[in-house]
A protein has these predicted regions:
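Mature, function-bearing regions of proteins
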Residues: 1-269, 273-286
């Protein structure tokens, strides 16, 4: 199995993200940014002076704080084991934004998982919303990277939690081309695309990315809120937020579940919260 190119064994993509709503109105926007493709067994060895510009922390991806010191890969393995998928010694590539200047917000992180023989095992799409919620969609292997899954996680207050996603997430190479469609009764309601061009990651590439896309991950979060406010001001109705459970910053309220090969314990229940989002404070990615 070949390694990723470059001095750090990782890839940086200069990306263009587009969002197009097809119902009930047709607003669209385009945003430029930068994404990393990394091997979870060989995260980029970013030198200490450059670490404020790029970091990959388990707590930025874990569905729940584990308090167990698991790596990103180990936490993903536990998730997969809960769905009867055994990763073994296979490779996992992760496409994501890096933590930069103390902050990260990832609307979509994608994991491409292969078994020990290098065969495609599954694809995992990890979605974050600005409520602080996180959710994963598990897709079976497909030669074209295509898959469908019901939508069961709140992302935008302008869409209810219904319909299904049609995802096209092929493992990238020199080019990155991802597409996500939201299909609802009556047809396609929303399409998001991410296109990018690869360059090997290293000190020079990281500095170039920092200069080309300063405050990139902050800009994503602010841009989402700005677009949400504009949609709200245009008269688009807002759907109440479904009940959510807050994520403690460092550890769960009770003892976390054990590893996949250990007997899980029962965590202390956390009261559910409900509220109606206001576009000025919490407007997730469309």
């Amino acid at each position: 199995m070949t390694t990723l190119p470059g001095p750090w064994g990782a890839v940086l993509y200069d990306t263009t993200t587009t969002h197009v709503r097809t119902a009930p109105r047709r607003p669209a926007f385009r945003h430029r940014g930068c994404l990393w493709l990394v091997d979870l067994d060989h995260l980029p060895p970013v030198p200490r002076p450059l670490r404020p510009l790029a970091g990959f922390r388990p707590q930025d991806h874990a569905l729940e704080p584990t308090g167990e010191g698991l790596t990103i890969r180990q936490e993903l393995e536990r998730y997969l084991a809960g769905h009867d998928v055994r990763l073994g010694d296979g490779r996992v590539l992760m496409l994501t934004q890096a933590r930069s200047l103390g902050y990260v917000f990832n609307p979509l992180t994608v994991y491409w998982c292969r078994d020990g023989a290098g065969r495609p095992l599954c694809t995992v799409a990890e979605v974050h919303n600005t409520y602080g919620g996180r959710h994963r969609y598990l897709l079976p292997p497909d030669p074209e990277g295509q898959g469908e899954t019901p939508k069961d996680f709140p992302v935008s207050p302008f869409f209810p939690v219904d319909g299904h996603y049609r995802m096209v997430l092929p493992e990238p190479g020199e080019r990155l081309r991802l597409t996500v469609h939201l299909e609802r009764d009556g047809g396609r309601a929303f399409t998001a695309t991410v296109h990018g061009t690869a360059r090997p990651a290293g000190p020079a590439a990281l500095l170039r990315a920092a200069l080309t896309h300063p405050f990139a991950t902050w800009a994503v979060s602010l841009h989402i809120r700005y677009r949400g406010i504009r949609l709200w001001l245009s008269g688009l109705p807002v759907h109440p937020r479904p009940p959510v459970h807050p994520r403690p910053p460092d550890r769960p309220p009770g003892r976390p579940p054990g590893r996949a090969d250990s007997a899980p314990s029962t965590p202390t229940p956390t009261p559910a919260l409900t509220s109606t989002p206001t576009p000025t404070e919490e407007v997730p990615t469309p």
